[in-house]
Swiss-Prot record:
Keywords: Coated pit, Cytoplasmic vesicle, Endocytosis, Golgi apparatus, Membrane. Residues 553-564 have a biased composition (Low complexity). Residues 310-381, 536-591 are annotated as: Disordered. This is Putative clathrin assembly protein At5g57200. GO terms for biological process: clathrin coat assembly; clathrin-dependent endocytosis. Residues 323-345, 355-369 have a biased composition (Acidic residues). GO terms for cellular component: clathrin-coated pit; clathrin-coated vesicle; Golgi apparatus; plastid. It comes from Arabidopsis thaliana. The keyword Membrane applies. It is found in: Membrane, Clathrin-coated pit; Golgi apparatus; Cytoplasmic vesicle, Clathrin-coated vesicle.
Length: 591
């Protein structure tokens, strides 16, 4: 066993010498690399002070941040590659001492580097070369967890407990920590971080062969030095938390109670840890503080308060306060300017009066301001804007010539013939004027009765008559232009006598065929049928005019039978020369 131990020491010394030689040749930071290698060599002893000081100077504030980052990278590389617990322990000791005694720039760069790469997470580290190495490897992993938690506590607290300068409180002989002056929310955030750090510290209790190792005791002494300040910071925070406890909400009070209970348990564990460390050689010169337990009666009082504590939290109160401020600001912005001017005038007039009257009139002014608040911009009853008037649509409606021709504003409704003349003179499509605005009749001096002129759906009876009259006139013009104009002279009279609305009176469905001439055979058949009907109706004329059935109608255009098949001469042209002779010569057929 002794031969194997000597071989390992010789092999470790050879590796250190080789690494130093390579650093002298290839490294750009020769002095820093050599100092790191010599401070973390394989010799089972604490790092030499001169090598540690070189590392302190390389990571000082006067050096570039790149040099500090390179130092952290070199230490991380040294820790990740080694499988020897002595080298790993020395690397952690150098990091711990630099955090405690070095410049804050090293702490900041190490925190930034740990976000990208976890330098202190060595949970898989193990040196199983000997039973001593086995026990020491376990303590190395615990020590690394404590240093990692120390960085996390610094991230939460924004300051280092060991580097904190404790001010003296007014009227007190002892110094106080920052936790004694923190608010309730900060205490609920920082005290759990400090308690977690103390938990990692208590876990650094060496076991087995590591208890008597000198290098382990050297590192443990550094941990014990920090335990004093950590406990004092937690104790001051607990005192401050107890003072605020009965003003907290139930949610915050539950958190505070858990912190208070954990502080009592950690005080017991820390007292046991101190008793365990008092037997160490390096801890003989330490003065361990006396730890006191919190009274159980106060713990019961805190539990009773939680049962009756209010539900709303301090955060909710702040949010409600902010919402009230925003609502007040919005109300002030929505208030009109005129009431403000009136208030100023009232204040000017009231300045001459006694103060008692001013106090009595202030509530009245507040009531007036509340009554003068403007209505909301959006009307909830008309979300679709159905009652809004489009200015463009109103302008088109006013400029519509057809609607003005039917219902001119300020005058009574004209006859259908007048509207027909206006339509023929040139108007827009009659489809656009089917529905007219309801306020046209209201402008007339003598409005027409609503029941007599209005149909279902808001349509006007006169409007429909004029539209159908316009349609009949247009069709007659088209038929005349097409060559079917024999009965054109009789059309205006027929139109004037007929009802313009075809749906108002039942008419002949074949009335439109009067302007078209039937075929010859049909005309002869209709002529015979007509003569037979005339003979049956007038027997007196049949006795004296036996040949009257050969006589043509004297004036076919004057007959206006609604059935085209009962009046065959309506479509036949009259002879130009024999018309007058037939009227005065009843026996002209005998010639």
């Amino acid at each position: 066993m002794g031969t194997f131990t000597s071989f390992r020491k010789a092999y470790g010394a050879l590796k250190d010498t080789t690494t130093v030689g390579l650093a002298k040749v290839n490294s750009e930071f020769k002095d820093l690399d050599i100092a790191i290698v010599k401070a973390t060599n394989h010799v089972e002893s604490p790092p030499k002070e001169r090598h540690v000081r070189k590392i302190f100077s390389a990571t000082s504030v006067i050096q570039p941040r790149a040099d500090v980052a390179y130092c952290i990278h070199a230490l991380s590389k040294r820790l990740s590659k080694t499988r020897n617990w002595v080298v790993a322990m020395k690397v952690l000791i150098v990091i711990h001492r630099t955090l405690r005694e070095g410049d804050p720039t090293f702490r900041e760069e190490l925190l930034n580097y740990s976000h990208r790469r976890h330098i202190l997470r060595i949970s898989n580290f193990k040196d199983d070369t000997s039973p001593l190495a086995w026990d020491c490897s376990a303590w190395v992993r615990t020590y690394a967890l404590f240093l990692e938690e120390r960085l996390e506590c610094y991230r939460v607290l924004k300051y280092d407990i060991e580097a904190e300068r404790l001010p003296k409180a007014s009227g007190a002989a002892s110094k106080t920590h920052r936790t004694r002056m923190l608010s309730g929310e900060d205490l609920l955030e920082q005290l759990p971080a400090l308690q977690q750090l103390l938990y990692r510290l208590i876990g650094c209790q060496p076991e087995g062969a590591a208890y008597s190792n000198y290098l382990i005791q050297y590192a443990l002494a550094l941990v014990l030095k920090e335990s004093f300040k950590i406990y004092c910071a937690i104790n001051d925070g607990i005192i401050n938390l107890v003072d605020m406890f009965f003003e907290m909400s139930r949610h915050d009070a539950v958190k505070a109670l858990n912190i208070y209970k954990r502080a009592g348990q950690q005080a017991e564990n820390l007292a046991e840890f101190y008793d365990y460390c008092k037997g160490l050689e390096l801890a003989r010169n330490f003065q361990f503080p006396t730890l006191r337990q919190p009274p159980p009666s106060f713990l019961a009082t805190m539990e009773e308060y939680i049962k009756e504590a209010p539900q709303s939290g301090s955060v909710q109160k702040k949010l409600e306060y902010q919402e009230k401020e925003e609502e007040e600001q919005e109300q002030e912005e929505e208030q009109p300017e005129e009431p403000a001017e009136e208030e100023n005038q009232n204040e000017n007039t009231e300045n001459d009066q006694p103060l008692i009257e001013e106090e009595e009139e202030e509530p009245k002014e507040e009531i007036e301001v509340e009554e003068a608040k403007p209505s909301p911009l959006i009307d909830t009853d008309d979300l679709l804007g159905l009652h809004e008037i489009n200015p463009k649509a109103a302008e088109i409606e006013q400029n519509n010539a057809f609607s003005l021709a039917i219902y001119p504003p300020g005058h009574e409704t004209s006859a259908p013939s007048n509207s027909l003349s206006l339509i023929e003179a040139g108007g827009s499509g009659w489809e656009l004027a089917l529905v007219t605005p309801q306020n046209n009749n209201n402008n007339n001096n003598n409005p027409r009765p609503v029941i007599a002129t209005k149909l279902g759906g808001g349509f006007d009876n006169l409007l429909l008559d004029s539209l159908y009259e316009d349609d009949t006139a247009r069709r007659q013009i088209q038929l005349t232009n097409a060559g079917y104009g024999f009965g054109a002279t009789a059309i205006p009279g027929a139109l004037a006598s007929s009802n313009p609305n075809p749906f108002g009176v039942q008419q002949d469905p074949f009335a439109m065929s009067n302007n078209m001439a039937p075929p010859t055979n049909v005309q002869m058949a209709m002529q015979q049928q007509q003569m037979m009907m005339m003979n049956n109706q007038s027997p007196y004329n049949n006795n004296y005019s036996p040949y009257h059935h050969h006589q043509f109608s004297p004036n076919p255009s004057t007959s206006s039978s609604p059935n085209p098949f009962g009046d065959p001469f309506l479509a036949l042209p009259a002879p130009p020369s024999s018309t007058t002779q037939q009227q005065y010569s009843p026996n002209h057929m005998l010639l």
